[in-house]
């Protein structure tokens, strides 16, 4: 007969505590540390990856670390598959090559990746566990709204840019490419889809993708490229979803200033769509070749009264065109002059050549004075940049230019 085994009360309590702890303690998600050896493999295999670019000496980075780790734990419980969502980090001092690759100019910087592709918009929201978790949940939500009736297409919000895909089957390569593009561009366009018999009237030549631009009178545009070619499909839809002339708001101002390009801005009243259309047409006609050297923007006069005051204007003066070089602001002449061929283009060229800055300080160039006309001393000090105040704040980030100056 086996001898009886007796446990003391203290031993029994200890055993129960260990058992309960093993059952109810959540598994801590590991933050992937990225380096030049593993970064491509980890990011390429992740549906969604949020990467924290940091430096140990940066106090904002230090404050973010425990928040980032806790948010990772929360999300890991909801998306347990390791490739569904990845939280990762890069020590930019140890891996300066990676920091340069992704043009990191401030710490911490939180960038989102989808299947290895870096999204243009980085995370700039609140640094809290809830905000980060909500952001990831939003990124994991379905980017395409499946319509149940073609009446939904008739009643679309035409103030938005809408991309509609008509497919025979949801389980198809055509739709998978469409959905992947939508996951990247859903902040810029509304994506909708229809399948089977519901979509049949719009599939007279097979699966079909249509762009409906803002405005009831604007004609639809049909995608004619390969439905299974991601790059071609993405480029076509991006061209439609990201306009040449973008609206600047207080929400996206930081993002736009960080692109580092001067602003050519039309200030207009919100309901003045005519001036906006004229400006858009002239930018497309005169300045398409300058797309990589300057940002074309429009702004609500009422919301951006302060920049207008900087150039001695008020909403009553709108529409007004100006350039903000992040050092100074320069005003275009009469808005009607934008219709003069080459006038707007010359204004931008004068910025790049330094003529605008030079003339503000020293008066008109000698070549601009008519023969026999006496030079007038009209030198002045141009208004300081107003939109540079929307740039990343030193109260949220360590800006690398500031550290370089130390």
Curated annotation (Swiss-Prot):
Q: Which SUPFAM superfamilies match?
A: Thioredoxin-like (SSF52833)
Q: Which Pfam families match?
A: Thioredoxin (PF00085), Thioredoxin_6 (PF13848)
Disordered as annotated region, ranges: 360-387
Q: Show the GO cellular component annotation of the record.
A: cell surface; endoplasmic reticulum lumen; endoplasmic reticulum membrane; endoplasmic reticulum-Golgi intermediate compartment
For this UniProt entry, the molecular function terms from Gene Ontology, in alphabetical order, are: protein disulfide isomerase activity
Q: Compositionally biased, Polar residues: which spans? A: 377-387
Query: Which UniProt keywords are given for this protein, alphabetically ordered?
Result: Chaperone, Disulfide bond, Endoplasmic reticulum, Signal
- Keyword Endoplasmic reticulum on this protein? yes
Start and end residues of each stretch annotated as Interaction with ITPR1: 236-285
**Full protein name:** Endoplasmic reticulum resident protein 44
Question: Species name for this entry?
Answer: Mus musculus
């Amino acid at each position: 007969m086996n001898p009886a085994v007796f446990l003391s009360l203290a031993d029994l309590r200890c055993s129960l505590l260990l058992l309960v702890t093993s059952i109810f303690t959540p598994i801590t998600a590991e933050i992937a540390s990225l380096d030049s050896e593993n970064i491509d493999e980890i990011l390429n295999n992740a549906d969604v990856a949020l990467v924290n670019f940091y430096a140990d000496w940066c106090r904002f980075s230090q404050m973010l670390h425990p928040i980032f780790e806790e948010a990772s734990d929360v999300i890991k419980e909801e998306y347990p598959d390791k490739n569904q969502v990845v939280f990762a980090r890069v020590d930019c001092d140890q891996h300066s090559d990676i920091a340069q690759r992704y043009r990191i100019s401030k710490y911490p910087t939180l960038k989102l990746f989808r299947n290895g592709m870096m999204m243009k918009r980085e995370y700039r929201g609140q640094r809290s566990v809830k905000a980060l978790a909500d952001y990831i949940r939003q990124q994991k939500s379905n980017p395409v709204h499946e319509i149940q009736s073609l009446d939904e297409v008739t009643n679309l919000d035409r103030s938005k840019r809408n991309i509609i895909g008509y497919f025979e089957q949801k389980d198809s390569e055509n739709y998978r490419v469409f959905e992947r593009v939508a996951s990247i561009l859903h902040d810029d366009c509304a994506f909708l889809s229809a399948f089977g018999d519901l979509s049949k009237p719009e599939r007279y030549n097979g699966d079909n993708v249509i762009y409906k631009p803002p405005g009831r009178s604007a004609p639809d545009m049909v995608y004619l490229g390969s439905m299974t070619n991601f790059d071609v499909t993405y480029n076509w839809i991006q061209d439609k979803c990201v306009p040449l002339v973008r609206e600047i708001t207080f929400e996206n101002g930081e993002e736009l200033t960080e692109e580092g390009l001067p602003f050519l801005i039309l200030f207009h009243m919100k309901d003045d769509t005519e001036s906006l259309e004229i400006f858009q047409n002239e930018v497309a006609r005169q300045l398409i070749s300058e797309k990589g050297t300057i940002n074309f923007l429009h702004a609500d006069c009422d919301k951006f009264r302060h920049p207008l005051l900087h150039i001695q204007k008020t909403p009553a003066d709108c529409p007004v065109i100006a350039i903000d070089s992040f050092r100074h602001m320069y005003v275009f002449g009469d808005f009607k002059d934008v219709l003069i061929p080459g006038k707007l283009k010359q204004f931008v060229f004068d910025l790049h050549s330094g003529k605008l800055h030079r003339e503000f300080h020293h008066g008109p160039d000698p070549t601009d004075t008519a023969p026999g006309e006496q030079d007038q001393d009209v030198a002045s000090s141009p208004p300081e940049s107003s939109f540079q105040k929307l740039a990343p704040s030193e109260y949220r980030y360590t800006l690398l230019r500031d550290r370089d100056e130390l």
